[in-house]
Amino acid sequence: MSYFEHIPEIRYEGPQSDNPLAYRHYDKSKKVLGKTLEEHLRIAVCYWHTFVWPGVDIFGQGTFRRPWQQAGDAMERAQQKADSAFEFFSKLGTPYYTFHDTDVSPEGSNLKEYSENFLRITDYLARKQESTGIKLLWGTANLFSHPRYAAGAATSPDPEVFAFAATQVRHALDATQRLGGDNYVLWGGREGYDTLLNTDLVRERDQLARFLHMVVDHAHKIGFKGSLLIEPKPQEPTKHQYDYDVATVHGFLLQHGLDKEIRVNIEANHATLAGHSFHHEIATAYALGIFGSVDANRGDPQNGWDTDQFPNSVEELTLAFYEILKHGGFTTGGMNFDSKVRRQSVDPEDLFYGHIGAIDNLALAVERAAVLIENDRLDQFKRQRYSGWDAEFGRKISSGDYSLSALAEEAMARGLNPQHASGHQELMENIVNQAIYSGR
């Protein structure tokens, strides 16, 4: 008997349905702005929260009793986990998945065992993909869970740890290539510090840059055509991480000549931990030319940590998709659910409830964002607000025709006395709410 045998395939039944195992808004074939919802969203389910996390927290042991988490041969359990995962993906109707190397494969007791196990499970995953049509959105390596990475991986004070991490990334990138992954993600879970008292900032930043250059070189060597992505996060588990937010990552990439090679994978909960909105981080990534992909989730505003809950705010998601759709949508990226059910949600159905609700919210957000784009009221106001910069005087300033003193003289000659014009923030907010709640 399979773990999800009693659960039917999840289908679209419309907004009037009371069936908790059905989509109310996600009609994957519905076209919005010329693409289907499936094409817009490129939904992925993550391996780690859905099939690896045992339901632990810092005060208690695991509450889940998944069959693949029980005692037995490690490789057999890995294959059982893959069987259950692909059954879940298939029944949910999601086209992509994501993983860390140690999510899918037993780590073993040394690098030789790690490599052999990972190669075997990569072949197994390839067969599962072929039989189901499900694809890999991105792969990555877990460089934060093992005690060897307590002081970081690329930023470790021990070069042997750096080399071990490089070996994992080499194999994870090779596996991603073998499985046709569209992206490879680098999340620096412990690439930061707990205290500056024992940290050499210059050395650690240089080490991280060297590591990233090695990853880029290997990607080119093996002919990887996907995108390389860094996932920003300000802190947790370390006090401060070097990939703090989108702007910080861009500055680091620019400093080290990597800005044309690596983009960002933006997680909603990481954005709020950094003191930003999800909307801000996506807009900033587009402004800097490094937008890549999204990890869809949310945090609890009353907690100061990464709770990785399923996204349930259509308002927040609408503004995120307003930016994404305005810039042409995803290319290699997609919406990966870096989300987990709560520790008390122990039934197999709960895994479906969490994803179904979140997918419906994403579908609604795409449709509402499309309304904002089609009515063009936000952009119309922006164009009018900045119209002075498109006139001759503004163009001459922007193009560098004036020096500081020349511009000051021009201002004096014109007798300039500009007055403030309303920013109409309240009107803009009303326009957004009208699109969300009235659909127009």
UniProtKB/Swiss-Prot annotation:
Cellular localisation: Cytoplasm
Record keywords: Carbohydrate metabolism, Cytoplasm, Isomerase, Magnesium, Metal-binding, Xylose metabolism
List of residues binding Mg(2+) 2: E267, H270, D306, D308
EC number: 5.3.1.5
Catalytic activity: alpha-D-xylose = alpha-D-xylulofuranose
Cofactor: Mg(2+)
Top-tier EC class: isomerase
Protein origin, superkingdom: Bacteria
Database matches in Pfam families: AP_endonuc_2
Biological process terms in GO annotation: D-xylose metabolic process
Record GO cellular component, one term: cytoplasm
Residues reported in the UniProt entry to bind Mg(2+) 1: E231, E267, D295, D338
Cofactor remark from the record: Binds 2 magnesium ions per subunit.
Catalytic site: H100, D103
Molecular function terms, GO-annotated: magnesium ion binding; xylose isomerase activity
Entry keyword annotation includes Signal: no
Recorded family membership: Belongs to the xylose isomerase family.
Entries under HAMAP family matching the protein: Xylose_isom_A (MF_00455)
Assembly mode: Homotetramer.
Listed name of the protein: Xylose isomerase
Species per Swiss-Prot/TrEMBL record: Paraburkholderia phytofirmans (strain DSM 17436 / LMG 22146 / PsJN) (Burkholderia phytofirmans)
